[in-house]
Design a protein with these regions (language model features):
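A compositional/biophysical signature of low hydrophobicity enriched in polar/charged and small residues
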Residues: 1-78
């Protein structure tokens, strides 16, 4: 049985680029939800990955976007 790795990625984004970053992130297949937020983080992303290695690739792809300044990843405990 394949167990999906569920995680949340929270990110700070360059000022004024929150919605642009969210639109780019929404296009990623593994992303199930993206919220632009107020507070410490600008964007919250819900991800479902096939493995921890797959999650690592997804997070790396998000971090490489020019709008993204910093991320933190919260991996769900089953």
């Amino acid at each position: 049985m394949v167990e999906i790795v569920k995680a949340y990625v929270v990110a700070t984004v360059k000022r004024g680029k929150e919605h642009e970053a969210a639109q780019k992130i929404r296009k990623m297949e593994e992303v199930t939800e993206v919220l632009v937020t107020y507070g410490l983080y600008d964007v919250v992303v819900r991800v479902e990955a096939k493995s921890l290695g797959h999650l690592d690739k997804i997070v790396t792809d998000i971090r490489q976007m020019v709008e993204i300044q910093q991320t933190s990843t919260l991996v769900g405990a089953q």
